[in-house]
Curated annotation (Swiss-Prot):
Residues 419-458 are cytoplasmic. Palmitoylation and association with LCK contribute to the enrichment of CD4 in lipid rafts. Phosphorylated by PKC; phosphorylation plays an important role for CD4 internalization. This is T-cell surface glycoprotein CD4. Forms disulfide-linked homodimers at the cell surface. Interacts with LCK. Interacts with PTK2/FAK1. Binds to P4HB/PDI. Interacts with IL16; this interaction induces a CD4-dependent signaling in lymphocytes. Interacts (via Ig-like V-type domain) with MHCII alpha chain (via alpha-2 domain) and beta chain (via beta-2 domain); this interaction increases the affinity of TCR for peptide-MHCII. CD4 oligomerization via Ig-like C2-type 2 and 3 domains appears to be required for stable binding to MHCII and adhesion between T cells and APCs. It comes from the Eukaryota. SMART domains: IG, IGc2, IGv. The Ig-like V-type domain mediates the interaction with MHCII. One of its GO terms (molecular function) is MHC class II protein complex binding.
Length: 458
């Protein structure tokens, strides 16, 4: 009987030797479609030893034979590899490149009579449409996942917008702050994998802008895009609605090709000038009240449905003095909250109204400021100098001129007077001479009728 004990021990040892390799607990690894993943497998001893990687169908993927890496007939043969430099450290990981959704499987590493199972789940996250979208359009993200999985997805935009869901996520009405890199996290079996998706929202940096100018100043309109593209082709137009006009009209049309701007048509009044390079830039030679109003610039990009829009407003200020009235006026779209003021510099005299015109009757002399303000912040300022209302002193040169004119008039008048007097005297002398002659003729008269009265008939 004592001889039977060692024999039983021998059988037990033999059975243990013939047992299959012990399987370790399964690990879960998440991978991204098109990316590279490394499945780890470590031996207890830091030395080079034999190992094999197989798929769930027990088909060999790769392994070691002597000191060389060998590959089996699997579909991963051209994309699987191992780090030979780490074999001496007991690390026998398998690297899979250019991951595909169908690579999702359970992979088995056999080393030192033990098996390590690694479950690989490959996910893909893509945008259903182009990643270059116009402002206001919708973005849809679709998750590709292996059969049998139930992942959840959470995405965050550059502007802080959060969306979450299952295999489909939708973002309606994209805004310009949504442009940039979106970070999406896919979760499965308490594991996560992160995706980065670049979304470009095609829009101008500002939806609306207002330019404040004094009458006569040059006006600059700028329309910088909120995105950068190597090639940008399209066409655009600026429509303008002047405050004084009954209808809007097209001020300018242009073409855009490879970031070069060419003008197609421009009005003669006003005659805008346009820059030839991006960003889009327009110059109005003078700010006049008849131009104050609102405009809408549209840009239609090639191969895109829809247009980019930016609204621009022009507010014009005028300060005038007419007789005894000082007036400050503005034209163009202004908020009812804006305040228009007339203020005498270095004095407390101020007239303010939430209106488009203010005035002062009989203003004091000095420098007056016309101010358009929003909650104390000055948006536009124009200065006008008021002169005293009393007559200004006559200059010496004016006195000389006036004296000369008066002397000339006096001399002319005296000349005329003496000429008339002299002529009158001459005519009077002639008249007296004529009277004397007539009297002389009367004394010597021997008319026949006189003799008839004094003589008797014979």
């Amino acid at each position: 009987m004592n001889r039977g004990i060692p024999f039983r021990h021998l059988l037990l040892v033999l059975q243990l030797a013939l047992l299959p390799a012990v399987t370790q607990g399964k690990k879960v690894v998440l991978g991204k479609k098109g990316d590279t993943v490394e499945l780890t497998c470590n031996a207890s001893q830091k030395k080079n030893t034999q190992f094999h990687w197989k798929n769930s169908n027990q088909i060999k993927i790769l392994g070691i034979q002597g000191s060389f890496l060998t590959k089996g007939p699997s579909k991963l043969s051209d994309r699987a590899d191992s780090r030979k430099s780490l074999w001496d450290q007991g690390c026998f990981s398998m690297i899979i490149k250019n991951l595909k959704i169908e690579d999702s499987d359970t992979y088995i590493c056999e080393v030192e009579n033990k098996k390590e199972e690694v479950e690989l789940l490959v996910f893909g996250l893509t945008a259903n449409s182009d990643t270059h979208l116009l402002e206001g359009q919708s973005l849809t993200l679709t998750l590709e996942s292996p059969p049998g999985s139930s992942p959840s997805v959470k995405c965050r935009s550059p502007g802080g917008k959060n969306i979450q869901g299952g295999r489909t996520l939708s973002v309606p009405q994209l805004e310009r702050q949504d442009s940039g890199t979106w970070t999406c996290t896919v979760s499965q079996d308490q594991k996560t994998v992160e995706f980065k998706i670049d979304i470009v929202v095609l829009a101008f940096q500002k939806a609306s802008s207002t330019v404040y100018k004094k009458e006569g100043e040059q006006v600059e309109f700028s329309f910088p895009p909120a995105f950068t593209l190597e090639k940008l082709t399209g066409s655009g137009e600026l429509w303008w609605q002047a405050e004084r006009a009954s209808s809007s009209k097209s001020w300018i049309t242009f073409d855009l090709k490879n970031k070069e701007v060419s003008v197609k048509r421009v009005t003669q009044d006003p005659k805008l000038q346009m820059g030839k390079k991006l960003p889009l830039h327009l110059t109005l030679p003078q700010a006049l009240p008849q131009y104050a109003g609102s405009g809408n610039l549209t840009l239609a990009l090639e191969a895109k449905t829809g247009k980019l829009h930016q609204e621009v407003n022009l507010v014009v200020m005028r300060a005038t003095q007419f007789q005894e009235n000082l007036t400050c006026e503005v034209w163009g779209p202004t908020s009812p909250k804006l305040t228009l003021s007339l203020k005498l510099e270095n004095k407390g005299t101020t007239v303010s109204k939430q209106a488009k015109a203010v005035w002062v009757l009989n203003p004091e002399a000095g420098m007056w400021q016309c101010l358009l303000s929003d909650s104390g912040q000055v948006l536009l300022e124009s200065n006008i100098k008021v002169v005293p209302t009393w007559p200004t002193p006559v200059q010496p040169m004016a006195l000389i001129v006036l004296g000369g004119v008066a002397g000339l008039l006096l001399f002319t008048g005296l000349g005329i007077f003496f000429c008339v007097r002299c002529r009158h005297r001459r005519r009077q002398a002639e008249r007296m001479s004529q009277i004397k002659r007539l009297l002389s003729e009367k004394k010597t008269c021997q008319c026949p009728h006189r003799f008839q009265k004094t003589c008797s008939p014979i």
